[in-house]
From Swiss-Prot:
Subcellular location: Cellular thylakoid membrane
Motif Chlorophyll-binding motif: positions: 25-30
Record note on disruption phenotype: No visible growth effect of the single mutant; double hliC-hliD deletions are out-competed by wild-type in high light (500 umol photons/m(2)/s). Quadruple hliA-hliB-hliC-hliD deletions die rapidly in high light but grow normally in normal light (40 umol photons/m(2)/s). Quadruple mutants are sensitive to norflurazon. In an hliD-PSI-less mutant phycobilin, protochlorophyllide and protoheme levels are reduced. A single gene deletion red-shifts the chlorophyll/carotenoid ratio.
Name assigned to this protein: High light-inducible protein HliD
């Protein structure tokens, strides 16, 4: 009678759907790599840098 009841399962916690989670960080990193590659390709073919695109040079 003095025994404490213990759960027989460990609750499964889901990853948060917002904020800094593993999926969001991977997606952000991949998008950054693709964007950086596109900037390099555009600079190579146009012979102009980012500052020239923005009108700062």
């Amino acid at each position: 009678m003095s025994e404490e009841l213990q759960p027989n399962q460990t609750p499964v916690q889901e990853d948060p759907k917002f904020g800094f989670n593993n999926y969001a960080e991977k997606l952000n990193g991949r998008a950054a790599m693709v964007g950086f590659l596109l900037i390099l390709v555009i600079e190579y073919f146009t012979n102009q840098g980012v500052l020239a695109w923005l009108g700062l040079r």
